[in-house]
């Protein structure tokens, strides 16, 4: 079968450059979605972030960083209180996600997946932020944020069906607190504010987090969502993955603001800038923002500085037309997987054998998910009509009958 041919040779050379292959004894972890509860606790001891801009918080415009690119700890006072197993699990998820990403790109090129937005380079933002949440917290993603959904419990095979436009890909399990990715840029910001308002009215200790790129911060829904959250002091986290380009438009050509974090000032909410290639810095920032939210202190805007190595999407974007190889090379030196791997190795928590095990685990999990997606019955128009209303109006009943007649032939 095709999926069984997935070998390390199908993963881009960038993944392996300086990056040894692996994962120890599977780290005691099974497939995607299993063993996630270890991250779904929030410490009451986390320091509370004050309502200040990033400039006021750090004394300059430098993003928060805990690990330097060489893996050394530069802010030991901000180190998250994670066990050795939890640190290894962060690495496992990042390695797994990169393998899955490369496989998805390959499947897209062969016509076996539809719309897909590559994630390589942004794993620290995705994995670090989701790991700081509880299972009860709600994720409202954009189209690039499939990893956060899957690590929050959304089945991987459904993610592949979603990419194919299959209705089953949009059926979210009742116990998984996510919405499907928002294609309308920044629309999820107002939706997240609404989810958070519901939590506040019910007195629930939960937060909503919404993800978007730097381009979304030029949209009206971004400002409306933040303003609403600011007025009502809602438990919501606005997480901007600033990879420097809104498709092909560089950051400096879409806003006169010095950075994204300062845009929180107008809404009267807290903000922070973090090194989005540092998984521990991301974890720390989201943990603080969550604590603020459940303590009734309101919303937080987080700007994570990161970089996508591949195209904006697989729909024909050519990043070489608007950025240089030299620029990408500079960002690859800050690679989140390489950085965290060096940190773990210095603590004796990671080895080449560990990494190899995770790669094999990821390849098998992706193969199994694709197989399950392939075996899912093809979607019928009559099924699509059934999910539009709880009780179908007469006009749709007639249309359904027509399609059922056609499908039965």
What are these regions (language model features)?
Residues 68, 141, 273-275:
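Structural signal for conserved beta-strand scaffold positions within catalytic alpha/beta enzyme cores
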Residues 99-102, 106-232, 250-256, 261, ...:
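Cofactor-binding active-site loop characterized by glycine-rich and histidine/acidic residues
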Residues 72-73, 146, 243-246:
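A short, flexible beta-alpha/helix-coil linker loop
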Residues 4-7:
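Short linear motifs in intrinsically disordered, low-complexity N-terminal regions enriched in Ser/Thr
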Residues 180-375:
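Glycine-rich ThDP/TPP pyrophosphate-binding loop and its adjacent helix/strand module
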Residues 143, 304-306, 388:
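A general secondary-structure junction signal
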Residues 15-124, 317-320, 325-409:
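Conserved acidic/glycine
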Residues 10-13:
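Intrinsically disordered, low-complexity segments enriched in serine/proline and basic residues
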